[in-house]
């Protein structure tokens, strides 16, 4: 199946059932909806980490560096042994950084799609 055929297969139900008038309208609607759901997904992930650690990403990164250097602790991980705290903190830091990166990227996509629709 060619790319064009794949696009037709995806958008045809939107046209047949009168949800959209053109392929471009259907593709735009799908793209905007998907981007918005991704923004929500990553915003929720970022909010989760902020809630758990009660701090910003930059401050958490500083806390993780201090923890790894045996100069600090992270209250949210106090229930764990020191080695487990380090592993969990490093894992969460990596996930949090990725969530922030993808949130920014999806927000940019969402803005671009909104601007394109307004043009």
Summary of predicted features, one role per range:
Residues 2-119:
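Extended, charge-rich alpha-helical interface modules
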């Amino acid at each position: 199946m060619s790319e064009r055929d794949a696009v037709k297969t995806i958008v045809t139900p939107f046209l047949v059932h009168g949800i959209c008038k053109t392929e471009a309208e259907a593709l735009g609607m799908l793209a905007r909806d998907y981007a918005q759901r991704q923004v929500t997904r990553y915003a929720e992930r970022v909010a989760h980490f902020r809630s758990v650690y009660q701090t910003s990403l930059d401050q958490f990164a500083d806390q993780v560096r201090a923890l790894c250097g045996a100069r600090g602790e992270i209250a949210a991980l106090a229930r764990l042994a020191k080695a487990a705290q380090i592993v969990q903190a490093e894992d969460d830091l990596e996930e949090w950084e990725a969530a922030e990166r993808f949130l920014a990227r999806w927000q940019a996509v969402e803005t671009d799609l909104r601007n394109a629709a307004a043009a």
